[in-house]
């Protein structure tokens, strides 16, 4: 159905398909910049969902949200990994990974209220706007952490590292 395309296939394929290439980019480029740009892109695209006048505009906006969101996770986890020593990483990354789940919980409750009182388009506009500010704040105030700053000597790559190296 059209709703399935908007909420599943169009979003999911792009999000999943871009995860590895963005992860590889995050290994080579400034992660802070990737996160800031992707946050801004997905926020602008979220707002574009609220002003879409046709199905195809909404579909393209949702696909653009997926592109932005796909670029946010790998660089963020990489940065968090470089900000904490190994013994604390599991806890810190677990706390970080709770964010999207709490976001969905809050988004459904608050978004439902906004949609009921102001229309579904307003919900997209209200939820997109803060991300633009957040992207700018990340760009201006978050520093790129030193890669491996808390790591000791490198360990030999395992089977997973060898397998992904060919990608």
Regions found by a protein language model. Give the residues of each.
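Cytoplasmic helix-loop-helix junction between adjacent transmembrane helices
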Residues: 61-102
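MFS 12-TM fold signature
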Residues: 11, 39-46, 65, 130-134
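Conserved MFS/SLC helix-loop-helix module at the cytosolic interface between two early adjacent transmembrane helices
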Residues: 17-53
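Extracellular/periplasmic helix-loop-helix junction of adjacent transmembrane segments
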Residues: 1-17
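Flexible cytoplasmic inter-helical loops of multi-pass small-molecule transporters
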Residues: 143-167
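Helix-breaking motifs and short loop linkers at transmembrane-helix boundaries and internal kinks
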Residues: 30, 51-57, 68, 85, ...
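Helix-loop-helix hairpin linking two adjacent transmembrane segments in secondary transporters
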Residues: 96, 100-146
């Amino acid at each position: 159905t059209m709703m399935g395309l908007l909420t599943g296939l169009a979003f999911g394929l792009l999000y999943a398909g871009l995860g590895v290439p963005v992860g590889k980019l995050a290994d080579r480029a400034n992660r802070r910049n990737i996160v800031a740009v992707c946050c801004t892109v997905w926020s602008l695209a979220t707002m574009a969902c609220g002003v879409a006048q046709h199905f195809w505009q909404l579909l393209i906006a949702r696909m653009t949200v997926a592109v932005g969101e796909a670029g946010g996770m790998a660089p963020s986890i990489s940065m968090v990994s470089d900000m904490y020593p190994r013994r604390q990483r599991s806890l810190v990354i677990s706390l970080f990974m709770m964010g999207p789940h709490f976001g969905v919980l809050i988004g459904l409750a608050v978004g439902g209220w906004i949609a009921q009182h102001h229309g579904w388009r307003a919900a997209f506009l209200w939820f997109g706007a803060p991300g633009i500010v957040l992207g700018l704040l990340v760009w201006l105030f978050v520093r790129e952490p030193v890669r491996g700053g808390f790591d000791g000597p490198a360990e030999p790559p395992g089977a997973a590292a060898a397998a992904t190296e060919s990608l």
